[in-house]
From Swiss-Prot:
Purpose of the protein: Core component of the CTLH E3 ubiquitin-protein ligase complex that selectively accepts ubiquitin from UBE2H and mediates ubiquitination and subsequent proteasomal degradation of the transcription factor HBP1. MAEA and RMND5A are both required for catalytic activity of the CTLH E3 ubiquitin-protein ligase complex. MAEA is required for normal cell proliferation. The CTLH E3 ubiquitin-protein ligase complex is not required for the degradation of enzymes involved in gluconeogenesis, such as FBP1. Plays a role in erythroblast maturation and in the development of mature macrophages.
Record InterPro entries: CRA_dom, CTLH/CRA, CTLH_C, Fyv10_fam, LisH, ZF_RING_GID
Transmembrane segments: none
Source organism of this protein record: Xenopus laevis (African clawed frog)
High-level lineage: Eukaryota, Metazoa, Chordata, Craniata, Vertebrata
Coiled-coil portions: none
Protein name, entry field: E3 ubiquitin-protein transferase MAEA
Oligomer and partners: Identified in the CTLH complex that contains at least MAEA, RMND5A, GID8, WDR26, and RANBP9 and/or RANBP10 as the catalytic core. Interacts with F-actin.
Cellular component aspect of the GO annotation: cytoplasm; cytoskeleton; GID complex; nuclear matrix; nucleoplasm; nucleus; plasma membrane
């Protein structure tokens, strides 16, 4: 029964933590399928048009040269259709194989062999680290780790490298790469009600004002802001006011609009929409897992100022993780467990808690191990007591 419960808990943890592992390649497959459908429909319509023109020419008994020319056109269109279909099918097949590979990898956690399970856990940890490094911008390190661990097909490197190109272009104060990304994901972004493309167009308008190209700014506004409504219309009205002020104005809000820090806001907005597009959380799985683990073992003893109650084997008590765990909730414990300060063993009926006259409690077995000539020395205060002075503690 306990084994089944443990397996069920592991299965639930996989569903929660490994969602991005399958969701990202699935979304890529879905996107490629829709693109293939559009490409094939478009090329099929081209073939239909030239075939109809050929049939019309044949019915009118035209010259042989005209028929041959039209036949060449039909062959050309069919060749293009075949090439586009093969390219689309190959791209879909690659995405489908990637989904299958990741499903097979996740199934390995239920292996009966201990060595296989340990290897799977190692790969899982490496996957978490790669994703975390990618989110933090350490792309080269992440790629090297993925290659060294042979998990390149189990992590979403391509997605993050694409995002890297977009973010770097925004850092250079360029919008074309990000606008191309918006165009590639236009339908999904529209369903998400994303304002990223609108924000980019606003920034382009601001840059034209900064360069004193006011007529170009007006043309830009007519082209891209004519359909604005609601809150977007209010923003358009605000930026249009910049036409009446110099580019070095100190009047608010135009001074804020001209602040180069807006590019950093665009990067954050792109990152947020990119995560939403692939249904990823704002934090990496590694961060979430680490925080959950720290919270599960965090106790008030980890933050005692005197430092005497800290356990050297406790991750939360360690200097590197103590500050990180500070804002996290304490561990939920329905049934308290008393742990001996000396040995680290649980104090129970086989190792009852014993209280010395100074109020400190230790396990009976630990007091026996440090007893000398019927005397015990308190490890905390260095006070010496008779062993018979230790009293048994009862927990109600």
């Amino acid at each position: 029964m306990a084994v089944q419960e443990s397996a069920a808990q592991l299965s639930m943890a996989l569903k929660v933590q490994e969602y991005p592992t399958l969701k990202v390649p699935y979304e890529t497959l879905n996107k490629r399928f829709r693109a293939a459908q559009k490409n094939i429909d478009r090329e099929t319509s081209h073939v239909t048009m030239v075939v109809a023109e050929l049939e019309k020419t044949l019915s009118s008994c035209s010259a042989v040269d005209s028929v041959v020319s039209l036949l060449d056109g039909v062959v050309e269109k069919l060749s293009v259709l075949k090439r586009k279909a093969m390219e689309s099918i190959q791209a879909e097949d690659e995405s489908a194989k990637l989904c299958k590979r990741r499903i097979e990898h996740l199934k390995e956690h239920s292996s009966d062999q201990t060595a296989a399970i340990n290897m799977w856990k190692k790969k899982r940890m490496d996957r978490m680290m790669v994703e975390h490094l990618l989110r933090c911008g350490y792309y080269n390190t992440a790629v090297k780790l993925a290659r060294q661990s042979e998990i390149e097909d189990l992590v979403n490197i391509e997605m993050f490298l694409t995002a890297k190109e977009v973010e770097e272009s925004l850092e250079r104060q360029e919008t074309m790469t990000c606008l191309a990304w918006c165009h590639d994901n236009k339908s999904r972004l529209r369903k998400m009600k994303s304002c990223l493309e609108f924000s980019l167009r606003i920034q382009e308008f601001i840059e034209l004002i900064r360069q004193n190209k006011r007529l170009d700014a007006v043309r830009h506004a007519r082209k891209h802001f004519s359909q604005a409504e609601g809150s977007q219309l209010d923003e358009v009205r605000q930026v249009m006011g910049m036409l009446a002020f110099p580019s070095d104005t100190h009047i608010s809000p135009y001074k804020d609009l001209l602040d180069p820090a807006r590019w950093r806001m665009l990067i954050q907005q792109f990152r947020y929409d990119n995560y939403r597009l692939h249904q990823l959380g704002n934090n990496s799985v590694f961060t979430i897992t680490l925080q959950a683990g720290l919270s599960a073992i965090k106790t008030p003893q980890c933050y005692k100022e005197d430092g005497t109650s800290k356990n050297p084997d406790c991750p939360v008590c360690s200097k590197s993780l103590n500050k990180l765990a500070q804002p996290l909730p304490l561990a939920h414990c329905a049934n308290s467990r008393l742990v001996c300060k000396i040995s680290g063993d649980v104090m129970n009926e086989n190792n009852p808690p014993m209280m010395l006259p100074n109020g400190y409690v230790y396990g009976y077995n630990s007091l026996l191990s440090i007893r000398q000539d019927d005397k015990v020395v308190c490890p905390r205060t260095k006070e010496v007591f008779n062993f018979s002075q230790a009293e048994k503690v009862y927990i109600m």
